[in-house]
């Protein structure tokens, strides 16, 4: 029999039923090959596992199986070299690969689709692809966490004004502040691992929606492809996109954490704060103002966060009105998912490098901490330790701060008699509690900002991250 590609002749795999060809406009509107071709490796891996199982079950002959393996190797070589011709008429990655395989090996290529539908095929492809991307993102998250820890360690003693409501609140270690983001990104990594468990289920064998009459060994295919198990309901297997939504939700939250870090980097770099500087390679200038150094990378990351969150909303909206089982709507899951992966990976990769290029300005940080009466809580705690109820101590200190503001002084600059006027329990040991360093060192509670605690957490993170 001729090896001419029957799919090419018919234009589509279902054309025998139809009396007129699909219009060119509809072809362009419905084709997905321009973007789903990135699934080619997963598609071929899934097909090879399916073919191996068909042969083991006696559904494919050994000769046909060998031909498929040989032909797929040629397809892989062509795709990797750029010689493979992706055809719009063949609509998607699946039919393009099947068509080329059939050109190469003849009828054996036509038998590959036995017991399979594109519905369970694409669900398998996306899960395989996404599983690999989750693993890659996990590695990037680890690299970003290590970069933050590397900057936190030499800055454990550096005093930064801690803020609530963007008002100076209490002094904190700059290293401690950076470790807060390590905690966020660690949770992101945990969430992605949890999502991966639900991604790692095999839909193949569900066929179009009802399963198949062929004696397929789905567990064998799952083992071959490294899946933890198989999807247990054929209708759900082909129509489920929860895993894509879950992943995009986890990615959105990760980008939100990047955006929060970006916002702080932007503020800290501004002249109003002047706490840090970013390396020139992450900034741009102005076409009109020669003095400008703009933090474009964190600004753009802040903007891209909205894009990823938008993809999450798109996927949720895509699924909300679909009846079981597969619908063409689901073709619209790929571009948001693909772009989410690309955006997140690029962002994490660049931020690991950006964080390592931060120049810290400790003097500016300490000056800012001194301006905001950051040790007021320490004075209240001092009075509590002298026997006052906290609410009474709070009121006493509020009066002291009001006086200090009127005199243009920090609390630590008020003389002892002035402080004793607010409460007689205040003695000459009070000034040790009112220094920024004293405030920092006092917070020895587990998870606190005392440098010793910061170093303890750094050691914990290094052990966890293997660095």
From Swiss-Prot:
Main location, first listed in the record: cytoplasm
InterPro entries for this protein: Arg_succ_lyase_C, Argininosuccinate_lyase, Fumarase/histidase_N, Fumarate_lyase_CS, Fumarate_lyase_fam, Fumarate_lyase_N, L-Aspartase-like
Family the entry assigns: Belongs to the lyase 1 family. Argininosuccinate lyase subfamily.
UniProt lineage: Bacteria, Pseudomonadati, Pseudomonadota, Betaproteobacteria, Burkholderiales
CDD domains documented for this protein: Argininosuccinate_lyase (cd01359)
GO molecular function, one term: argininosuccinate lyase activity
GO cellular component assignments: cytosol
Domain of life: Bacteria
Stored Pfam families: ASL_C2, Lyase_1
Keywords for this protein: Amino-acid biosynthesis, Arginine biosynthesis, Cytoplasm, Lyase
Pathway this chain belongs to: Amino-acid biosynthesis; L-arginine biosynthesis; L-arginine from L-ornithine and carbamoyl phosphate: step 3/3
Protein name as it appears in the record: Argininosuccinate lyase
Naturally occurring in which organism (per UniProt): Methylibium petroleiphilum (strain ATCC BAA-1232 / LMG 22953 / PM1)
């Amino acid at each position: 029999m001729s090896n001419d590609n029957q799919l090419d002749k018919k234009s589509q795999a279902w054309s025998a039923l139809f009396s007129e060809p699909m219009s060119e406009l509809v072809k362009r509107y419905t084709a997905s090959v321009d973007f789903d071709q990135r699934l080619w490796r997963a598609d071929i891996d899934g097909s090879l596992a399916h073919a191996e199982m068909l042969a083991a079950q006696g559904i494919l002959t050994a000769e046909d199986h060998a031909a498929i393996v040989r032909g797929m190797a040629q397809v892989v070589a062509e795709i990797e070299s750029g010689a493979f011709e992706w055809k719009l008429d063949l609509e998607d990655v699946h039919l393009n690969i099947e068509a080329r395989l059939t050109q190469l090996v003849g009828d054996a290529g036509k038998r590959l689709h036995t017991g399979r539908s594109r519905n369970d095929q694409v669900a398998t492809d996306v899960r395989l692809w996404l599983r690999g991307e989750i693993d890659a993102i996990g590695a990037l998250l680890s690299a970003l966490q290590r970069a933050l820890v590397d900057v936190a360690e030499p800055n454990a003693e550096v005093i930064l004004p801690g803020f609530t409501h963007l008002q100076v609140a209490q002094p904190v270690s700059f290293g401690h502040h950076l470790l807060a983001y390590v905690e966020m990104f660690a949770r992101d990594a945990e969430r992605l691992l949890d999502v991966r468990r639900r991604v790692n289920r095999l839909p193949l064998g569900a066929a179009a929606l009802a399963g198949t009459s062929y004696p397929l060994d789905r567990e064998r295919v799952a083992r071959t492809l490294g899946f933890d198990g198989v999807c247990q309901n054929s209708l759900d297997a082909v129509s489920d996109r929860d895993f894509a939504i879950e992943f995009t939700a986890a990615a959105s939250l990760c980008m939100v954490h990047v955006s929060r870090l970006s916002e702080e980097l932007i503020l800290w770099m501004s002249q109003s704060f002047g706490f840090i500087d970013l390396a020139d390679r992450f900034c741009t200038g102005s076409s009109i103002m020669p003095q400008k150094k703009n933090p474009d990378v964190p600004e753009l990351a802040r903007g891209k966060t909205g894009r990823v969150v938008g993809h999450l909303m798109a996927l949720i909206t895509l699924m909300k009105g679909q009846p079981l089982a597969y619908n063409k709507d689901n073709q619209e899951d790929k571009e948001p998912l693909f772009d989410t992966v690309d955006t997140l990976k690029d962002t994490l990769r660049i931020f690991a490098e950006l964080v390592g290029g931060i120049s810290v300005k400790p003097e500016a940080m300490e000056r800012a901490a001194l301006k905001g009466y950051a040790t007021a809580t320490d004075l209240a705690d001092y009075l509590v330790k002298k026997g006052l109820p906290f609410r009474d101590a709070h009121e006493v200190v509020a009066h002291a701060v009001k006086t200090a503001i009127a005199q243009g002084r920090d609390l630590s600059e008020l003389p002892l008699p002035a402080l004793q006027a607010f409460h007689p329990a205040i003695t000459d040991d009070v000034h040790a509690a009112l220094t920024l360093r004293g405030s920092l060192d006092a917070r020895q509670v587990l998870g606190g900002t005392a440098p010793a605690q910061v170093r303890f957490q750094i050691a914990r993170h290094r052990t966890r991250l293997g660095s």
